Amino acid sequence: MQFREGTVFDLRSDVFKLVSAMKRLIFAALVTAALPLAACSKDFDNSTVKEFDLSRYLGEWYEVARYNHSFECGMDNTMAQYILQDDGKVVVLNTGWKDGKFKLAEGKAKYPDPADDPGHLRVSFFLFFYSDYNVMMVDENYQISLVGSKAEKYLWILSRTPVPDPDLLDMVLDEAAKRGYDTSKLIWVDQSRNIEALESAD
């Protein structure tokens, strides 16, 4: 077999290119493999309160502020009611004003681990699809609460009154910020219809 002049150098060059390409592929594979691990590390804290009394949490809560999301888009005067049934299950009634009328969504809540994780509930509004309901803060008198979920894109501030006490509101906003949530993204909910209804009832 005869080699033309420069063939050996061409082969060496090809081998070098092949090795370089393999190194790039290996590096890319390692980076890709590391992405899920990076995604799992979160920069927000959605841990639940360690002391929580469900019986004191029951009743009506007004939605003061929330992150924007599809299932409440364009809705105001929103509120939630939590009702304990005789069988121990919790019924969830969510109401809100949209398209010129109040709309009602009825759901249910489970209490998976009241002993070790008392501030964690699971709420469903459709069949057997449940979402995490994390009570991340509630004041000692159960007048205001900060609620999150598994993902950072969900955040709610709930109050027993349509207009919360300013000091309590500042407290819950500080807590949200400490946990890594961007409070500038909060949508402040118009509660004028609920306020009017309360005033009319007095």
What are these regions, as identified by a protein language model?
Residues 8-21:
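Short, Lys/Arg-enriched N-terminal segments with co-localized hydrophobic residues
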Residues 23-26, 43-44:
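Hydrophobic alpha-helical segments with strong N-terminal bias
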Residues 25-34:
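Sec-dependent N-terminal signal peptides
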Residues 40-202:
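A beta-rich soluble binding module of mature secreted/lumenal proteins
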